[in-house]
């Protein structure tokens, strides 16, 4: 009976240990040179672009599976090829600047083999262009 109890205990313990696999975080795989970019004041209707540069700090190639944004006004583009160990890659982020207002948008980066997404941020303020302001005043 003791042997059965010990065997069952050992089995439960080993399953519990195996279930606690170490989760890899994005910061363990890549290092971004910046995680936030402020465009400052930009003219309405003038799209702006920023490249978030990152370095693969792991010993395996990194694949960016997906890049998405918090709204349709922000368009991220991911590298199509794997980024080798020690190499750098870029995430292109374009903001359309259609609406006059301050903005704070998030870009979500999904890396292969990493459960949690990396979140990048862009901020700024879209101001009315002088042409739009003049047209409104003349009406």
Give the role of each language-model region:
Residues 109-115:
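Short, exposed beta-strand-loop hairpins at the edges of beta-sheets
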Residues 96-101, 112:
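Short, surface-exposed loop/turn segments at beta-strand-coil junctions that are enriched for proline
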Residues 54-58:
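Asparagine-centered strand-capping/turn motif at beta-strand->loop junctions
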Residues 20-46, 53, 115-139:
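Long, low-complexity ectodomains and other extracytoplasmic segments of secretory-pathway proteins
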Residues 1-23:
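Bacterial Sec-dependent N-terminal signal peptides
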Residues 59-85:
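Surface-exposed binding patches on compact interaction domains or structured appendages
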Residues 37, 87-93:
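Short strand-edge motifs at loop-to-beta-strand transitions and within beta-strands
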């Amino acid at each position: 009976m003791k042997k059965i109890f010990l065997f069952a205990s050992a089995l439960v313990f080993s399953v519990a240990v195996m279930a606690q696999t170490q989760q890899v975080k994005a910061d363990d795989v890549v290092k971004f040179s910046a995680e936030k970019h402020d465009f400052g004041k930009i003219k309405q209707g003038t799209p702006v672009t920023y490249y978030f540069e990152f370095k693969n700090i792991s010993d395996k190639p990194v694949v960016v599976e997906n890049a998405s944004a918090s709204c349709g006004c922000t368009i991220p583009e991911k590298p199509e090829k794997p980024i080798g160990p020690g190499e750098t890659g870029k995430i292109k982020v374009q903001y359309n600047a259609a609406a006059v207002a301050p903005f704070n948008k998030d870009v979500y980066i999904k890396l292969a083999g990493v459960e949690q997404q990396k979140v990048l941020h862009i901020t700024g303020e879209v101001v009315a262009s002088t042409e739009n302001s003049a047209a409104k005043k003349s009406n």
